[in-house]
């Protein structure tokens, strides 16, 4: 890996959960530069359309460039076709772009999630352009192994919005306790047919388990 891609990384734990009627995309907020905490307020959940979001893990510069590209591509898709882009189509556009650049890859792990006429869905997209439709939940980044332990244990089908938020926050908290590249609080986005909402910090605090 070149020095350029070693400079600033998001480190990261990201989580995507499908619930009854929508999707939760959640991340923590730490960005690292080697052993240095480079940022305590890194934004890792981005709006792609009013019904689709994307989380980023990996190189900050690579990820931010991809956010700009997919924003433009989704806007062009909707202008040309005169209809809203689906979650699957957005993931495919991103996947194709990454695959075309696989010999000079972007150092990223991405989640693309949202709602369309088929309902809620979340896709994971790797640096080579591999896109996978995740049925229930997914986690990426350096803290994902710890997050998966919580997700596997506590996920249940047809969760409510409240239950899904609580699970996402709990999974992130577990990762932050064990992964040095994850920390500094939470970003949580709720996506349904009615809203694309960034959950404020005071509301997120209400989902945190009591301190031991």
Swiss-Prot record:
It catalyses: Cleavage of peptide bonds with very broad specificity. The active site is at 12 (nucleophile). Residues 1-11 form a propeptide. It is found in: Cytoplasm. Its EC number is 3.4.25.1. Gene3D superfamilies: Glutamine Phosphoribosylpyrophosphate, subunit 1, domain 1. This is Proteasome subunit beta. It comes from Methanocorpusculum labreanum (strain ATCC 43576 / DSM 4855 / Z).
């Amino acid at each position: 890996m070149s020095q350029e891609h070693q400079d600033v990384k998001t480190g990261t734990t990201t989580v995507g959960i499908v619930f009854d009627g929508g999707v939760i995309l959640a991340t923590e907020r730490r960005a690292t530069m080697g052993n240095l905490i480079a940022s305590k307020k890194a934004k890792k959940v981005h709006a792609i359309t009013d019904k689709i979001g994307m989380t980023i893990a990996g190189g900050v510069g690579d990820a931010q460039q991809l956010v700009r590209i997919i924003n433009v591509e989704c806007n062009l898709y909707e202008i040309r076709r005169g209809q809203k882009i689906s979650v699957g189509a957005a993931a495919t556009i991103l996947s194709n772009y990454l695959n075309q650049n696989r010999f000079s890859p972007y150092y990223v792990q991405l989640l693309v999630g949202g709602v369309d006429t088929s309902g809620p869905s979340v896709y994971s997209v790797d640096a080579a352009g591999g896109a996978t439709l995740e049925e229930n939940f997914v986690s990426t980044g350096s803290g994902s192994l710890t997050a998966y332990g919580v997700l596997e244990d506590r996920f249940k089908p047809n969760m409510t919005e409240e239950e899904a938020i609580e699970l996402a926050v709990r999974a992130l908290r577990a990762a932050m306790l064990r992964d040095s590249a994850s920390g500094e609080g939470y970003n949580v986005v709720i996506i349904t047919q009615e809203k694309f909402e960034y959950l404020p910090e005071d509301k997120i605090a209400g989902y945190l388990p009591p301190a031991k």
